[in-house]
């Protein structure tokens, strides 16, 4: 594992890297200079998490409408979110996994918007031939994927982590509403919800917003 190269790909300083992965700053310096080496199990785990973050953060700009691309069914033509997502699945007709807001719709935790345009997915880059599609990554662990109503989508914890990783381009209304519904349907508890350590502080702020969501 070339830590310096992976850190550079993330676009992080040593300090930013240390804070993101909850590693002492001096330790990061020592690992990069070769003064010390991380234990093998830790190196493997860290590399796995970094590469996942690189996949999740591959999208930095939302796509604009391109008349040369194919159009997907529009949300306003369907009464419910699920019927819209099924129509999208039928048009794409290849293997993919719904992510972020669309995953929350599949989970029944977010109703979506009537003017919805962006569709977040995991799958082949070839899916970008459709207007509105944003490919978060080409691969995702089957342990993070659920299936219901003939739709495949990321589970809540993966959806939450993806939201944190893509915060700079994501409207947080969906994940905030979803967490609020989860909280109040589980006896005012977030039991079962978990995030990586680097997202814990951000999650706690988001959880506060979620508990107040329907009272505002």
Identify the meaning behind each predicted range.
Residues 40-59:
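DNA major-groove recognition helix of helix-turn-helix/homeodomain DNA-binding modules
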């Amino acid at each position: 594992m070339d830590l310096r190269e992976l850190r550079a790909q993330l676009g992080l300083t040593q300090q930013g890297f240390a804070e993101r992965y909850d590693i002492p700053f001096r330790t990061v310096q020592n690992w990069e200079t070769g003064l010390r080496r991380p234990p093998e199990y830790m190196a493997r785990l860290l590399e796995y998490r970094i590469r996942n973050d690189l996949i999740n953060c591959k999208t930095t700009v939302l796509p604009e409408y391109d008349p040369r691309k194919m159009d997907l069914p529009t949300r306003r033509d369907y009464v419910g979110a699920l019927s819209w997502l099924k129509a999208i699945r039928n048009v794409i007709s290849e293997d993919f996994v719904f992510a972020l807001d669309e995953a929350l719709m599949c989970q029944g935790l977010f109703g979506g918007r009537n003017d919805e345009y962006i569709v977040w997915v995991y799958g082949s880059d070839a899916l970008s031939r459709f207007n509105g599609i944003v490919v978060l990554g080409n691969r995702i662990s089957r342990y993070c994927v659920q299936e219901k109503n003939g739709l495949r989508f990321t589970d809540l914890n993966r959806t939450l982590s993806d939201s944190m990783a893509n915060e700079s381009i994501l409207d947080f209304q969906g994940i905030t509403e979803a967490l609020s519904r989860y909280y109040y349907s589980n006896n005012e508890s977030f039991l079962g919800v978990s995030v990586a350590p680097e997202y814990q502080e951000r999650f706690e702020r988001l959880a506060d917003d979620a508990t107040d969501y329907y009272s505002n």
